[in-house]
């Protein structure tokens, strides 16, 4: 189920189980994982397959392997808060994913996360090709970090 309220999403989580975050791009899907205490977000991997069945199967494998209790999906909206073509694509993907999982799904504003991830990697002297291979997973970890920080800030 897709949850629009962070407090409600948090109430549905199982204690001591991690979350995953997804940065759903047009060419790659970045995946990040939290620790069990919901304190740290870490880039996990990048899915380069564009077939949604394969993407969902890959995500289901990650969910099972890490015993994930919830999913955060980055929602791309424009700088003024409006809906874009990619917003609609991500919403359709979230709807499709919810048919395959019984976990709560939370959509988090992801404005500028991929750009921030690329700049972060660049600051370490990582070459463009390597940045492009990893920026979506790092962006997913930034999206997840936003949610984890909000949970901490609101003492959820």
From Swiss-Prot:
Give the chief site where it resides: cytoplasm
Top-level taxon of the source organism = Bacteria
Q: Which InterPro entries does the entry link to? A: RNaseH-like_sf, YqgF, YqgF/RNaseH-like_dom, YqgF/RNaseH-like_dom_sf
Q: Which GO terms describe its biological process?
A: rRNA 5'-end processing
CC per GO annotation: cytosol
Q: State which Enzyme Commission number(s) the record gives.
A: 3.1.-.-
Q: Which GO terms describe its molecular function?
A: nuclease activity
Q: Where in the cell is it found?
A: Cytoplasm
Annotated signal sequence range: none
- Keywords noted in UniProt: Cytoplasm, Hydrolase, Nuclease, Ribosome biogenesis
Q: What the protein does?
A: Could be a nuclease involved in processing of the 5'-end of pre-16S rRNA.
Record-stated family: Belongs to the YqgF nuclease family.
Q: Which protein are we looking at?
A: Putative pre-16S rRNA nuclease
Q: Taxonomic lineage of this organism?
A: Bacteria, Pseudomonadati, Pseudomonadota, Alphaproteobacteria, Rickettsiales
């Amino acid at each position: 189920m897709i949850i629009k309220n962070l407090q409600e999403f948090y109430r549905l989580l199982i204690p001591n189980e991690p979350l995953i975050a997804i940065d759903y791009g047009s060419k790659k899907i970045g995946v990040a994982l939290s620790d069990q205490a919901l304190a740290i977000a870490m880039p996990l991997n990048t899915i380069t397959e564009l077939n949604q069945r394969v993407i969902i199967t890959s995500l289901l494998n990650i969910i099972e392997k890490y015993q994930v209790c919830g999913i955060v999906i980055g929602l791309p909206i424009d700088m003024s808060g409006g809906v874009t073509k990619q917003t609609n694509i991500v919403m359709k993907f979230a709807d499709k994913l919810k048919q395959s999982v019984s976990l709560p799904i939370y959509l988090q504003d992801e404005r500028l996360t991929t750009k921030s991830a690329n700049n972060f990697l660049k600051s370490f002297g990582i070459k463009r090709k390597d940045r492009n291979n990893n920026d979506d997973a790092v962006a997913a970890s930034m999206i997840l970090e936003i949610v984890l920080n909000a949970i901490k800030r609101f003492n959820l």
